[in-house]
Swiss-Prot record:
The lineage of its organism: Eukaryota, Metazoa, Chordata, Craniata, Vertebrata. Its main location: secreted. The active site is at residues 63, 105. This is Basic phospholipase A2 ammodytoxin C. Belongs to the phospholipase A2 family. Group II subfamily. D49 sub-subfamily.
Length: 138
């Protein structure tokens, strides 16, 4: 519970669905989303280019693609509601955009959990300069 409080305090300045996404990540992985995923590999965090470094980084690549398929939505600022049923993330009722953003975030959080065993600390705070390859297409 203490970790949850610390993450919530750290995310107060974050707008929109990034807050919900962070809470989903924490709930699925037990990891602090800011320190564990914000600057991981070539795709976790703002932007992204090159080849995903591992399965976790690929989760971020797919998440970026998912957001890219929502041209009429604002994934980083539109808020949505979700809850848990028997431990599973369930997106709440909302607008079409809110629901699609929630589903993108839900899929990424689950992907992070499924790939916890291959999470590699060498990709935390990974320098962008090492992501030189041409990006894959979504």
């Amino acid at each position: 519970m203490r970790t949850l409080w610390i993450v919530a305090v750290c995310l107060i300045g974050v707008e929109g669905s990034l807050l919900e996404f962070g809470m989903m990540i924490l709930g699925e992985t037990g990891k602090n989303p800011l320190t564990s995923y914000s600057f991981y590999g070539c795709y976790c965090g703002v932007g992204g280019k090159g080849t995903p470094k591992d399965a976790t980084d690929r989760c971020c690549f797919v998440h970026d693609c998912c957001y890219g398929n929502l041209p009429d939505c604002s994934p980083k600022t539109d808020r949505y509601k979700y809850h848990r049923e028997n431990g599973a993330i369930v997106c709440g009722k909302g607008t079409s955009c809110e629901n699609r953003i929630c589903e993108c975030d839900r899929a990424a959080a689950i992907c992070f959990r499924k790939n916890l065993k291959t999470y590699n600390y060498i990709y935390r705070n990974y320098p962008d300069i090492l992501c030189k390859e041409e990006s894959e297409k979504c």
